[in-house]
């Protein structure tokens, strides 16, 4: 059987079958059978099948990969990249929102402010973090942290992974739209360097609120859009089953968004996606983040602010 801890997507069935065959042969080998060459041969076939499959993913398949439950989350990047991380809680207006985590720590020896959505990896943690869908308190907390970082001249890193801001009645009553707008404006107005990385889903204003950065990076199989394919399908065709068609037409992939100038760079994922090797994904992402901050290191506050605002104005003019 394939690794019971690994969750295979529907389109990965051919790879799952090869992995299952390898596991069966390994069980035979453990009982004394000399089948090492056969195991190696099938292993090579599985690796090539995985490589070929992921080299030609459709936008809808990338959407599934971006949502994979074993994909590295915000907490994984914090553990792998940030030392001495100290999370801060509360928006000082209403309460705490654990869908959006933020705090201060050190990235490769230098002080940094980190904010981002945490989806959770278990049923309990997903409920705790509201599946990464932040309420107004989360975005107001992000504003509070960004203001602190700006005051103390500390760069800001945003790790984006959310289907969108939480659309509940309470969230709307407490000013969800205003909180998102305020967070977006704060990102644009920072006098310190800020880098955003789309690590999974970048959904609507909930993502943009912390992603209007000097450099926007995106993992190879992540997605970034104003609405989910399912919701777009329901609106356009009154039929959510056309999500695959919607995903194609919406241009939500990193490759499309780089071509449009919405993002600045695509970060390669390990063969088979980030969920197959989270540690390698985190390490590669860390290198790209360091390079992005290094590019911004010598820019003064006014230049950072002006270049960032101009960057997003240009995107609007180009795509408007």
UniProtKB/Swiss-Prot annotation:
Recorded catalytic activity of this chain's protein: N(6)-carboxybiotinyl-L-lysyl-[protein] + acetyl-CoA = N(6)-biotinyl-L-lysyl-[protein] + malonyl-CoA
Biological process according to GO: fatty acid biosynthetic process; malonyl-CoA biosynthetic process
Enzyme Commission number(s) from the entry: 2.1.3.15
Lineage top rank: taxon: Bacteria
Keywords, ordered alphabetically: ATP-binding, Cytoplasm, Fatty acid biosynthesis, Fatty acid metabolism, Lipid biosynthesis, Lipid metabolism, Nucleotide-binding, Transferase
HAMAP family listed in its UniProt record: AcetylCoA_CT_alpha
Function: Component of the acetyl coenzyme A carboxylase (ACC) complex. First, biotin carboxylase catalyzes the carboxylation of biotin on its carrier protein (BCCP) and then the CO(2) group is transferred by the carboxyltransferase to acetyl-CoA to form malonyl-CoA.
Protein name: Acetyl-coenzyme A carboxylase carboxyl transferase subunit alpha
Classification lineage: Bacteria, Pseudomonadati, Pseudomonadota, Alphaproteobacteria, Hyphomicrobiales
